[in-house]
Structures are given as structure tokens and as C-alpha cells.
Amino acid sequence: MKSAVILLPGLNRNRDMIAALTKITGQAPVTVWQTDTSIPDDVDLILIPGGFSYGDYLRCGAIAARMPVMQAVREKADKGVMVMGVCNGFQILLEAGLLPGALMRNASLKFVCREVKLEVTNANTSFTRGYKPGQIIRCPVAHHDGNYFADAETLKRLEGEGQVVFRYAEGTNPNGSVNDIAGIVNARGNVLGMMPHPENLIEAAHGGDDGRALFAGALGITA
């Protein structure tokens, strides 16, 4: 199974993402730059890592979402290719219209960097199939604009159709996200956006491997 990591100016978690994918799959992902207009046909998973693309000017992810490479990402997503955006990557997916809702400033108005607990609220997706329903996993967060918001109608649809796949658990919501939402998928289930960083927990020797199953599930391999 082959993966690709999108590179944009200001992203700073691409090395972590590449290292995680290389460790899990045994091969380094291909990298695709902002000005590229296509993504290799044999790619099974596209990842947009975290950071501060274009310095978070205008809005987090707003400029990145309008780069040529994002049209290629849209085309792949429309064909059913798995797409995952983490932190700034989640913000970019929202700005690109690949996921519903918006991410606002943290309720504290401060940058938050700590470990949180996540509840797996839907284990019946290609991303989350390596977990059990209701399982609590550990995951670090590091963001200033992670406060997820959507209007009442959108929230009702997300909750009713099982599109909320991760929720901040046990009072660990770090940003004020509505309904404690930490990660969502699109209606088709092949696009995931989440604020926590699973790529930083894929080896037990480095603090834990709770994030490993997420990548393995998306790629259809054994964790």
C-alpha cells in the first residue's frame, strides 16, 4: 500500500508523518509539493500534516486550500482514495470544503500543547477499524485554533450518521470544541480530519503506540 504526504510552506510535522508511515509500512511515502497538479495513481492514502501553512495568514489553512495540489486531492477523494488531515491538515480540509464545519481559536485563546484522551466513537470506518467502539486512546495535541464548530443542522447530521469518529474524553477537551469533537469523516468515510497528532504515538518505546492502528487501518495492513 502506497501513501503520499502533501508538502506546503509552513507545515512542520511532515517529517513526523513521513517517519510514522515509513515505520508502519516499511517504505517511505512519496511527497507531493504545493504546485503539483497531480498525485501518483497508485497512492492509497494521502496525508496533510500539521504546522502553520503560509503562516496561518487570513485563516488557518485558507491559503493552502487554494493551492493547485488541493484540486488533485479533491479529485482523488472523489474517486474514493483515503485522505487524512491532521491539525493544520484538518483546517485545510475544512477550508477546501472536503469536510463540514470550521475550526476557531481555542476557547482559552492560548496555544495548547499536551496529551489528551480520545474516545473512539465510531470504529466502523476504514480509519478506525483497528480500534474497539468506545475505546479510550492517548494522543498529543498542539494547536491554537482547534475549537471545532458547526451549525445545529450539520452537527445533527454528523452525529446521526456516525461521522464523529473521535471525541475528547474524560474532561480533556483542550479547546472548547462543540460536542467534544476531535475528529470527523466525510459522508463517504474516506476523508478524515482530526486535531490530535496520532503520528507521534506509533512506537511503544517513544511513549506509546495508540496512533498506529489509525494508519494501519487506513492502509488496510496489520498494525
From Swiss-Prot:
Domain of life according to the entry: Bacteria
Subunit structure: Part of the FGAM synthase complex composed of 1 PurL, 1 PurQ and 2 PurS subunits.
UniProt domain Glutamine amidotransferase type-1: residue ranges: 3-223
Entry-linked CDD domains: GATase1_FGAR_AT (cd01740)
Keyword Hydrolase attributed: yes
EC number: 6.3.5.3, 3.5.1.2
Keywords: ATP-binding, Cytoplasm, Glutamine amidotransferase, Hydrolase, Ligase, Nucleotide-binding, Purine biosynthesis
An annotated GO BP: 'de novo' IMP biosynthetic process
Pathway: Purine metabolism; IMP biosynthesis via de novo pathway; 5-amino-1-(5-phospho-D-ribosyl)imidazole from N(2)-formyl-N(1)-(5-phospho-D-ribosyl)glycinamide: step 1/2
Protein name: Phosphoribosylformylglycinamidine synthase subunit PurQ
Active site: 87, 197, 199
Gene3D superfamilies reported for this sequence: 3.40.50.880
Record GO cellular component, one term: cytoplasm
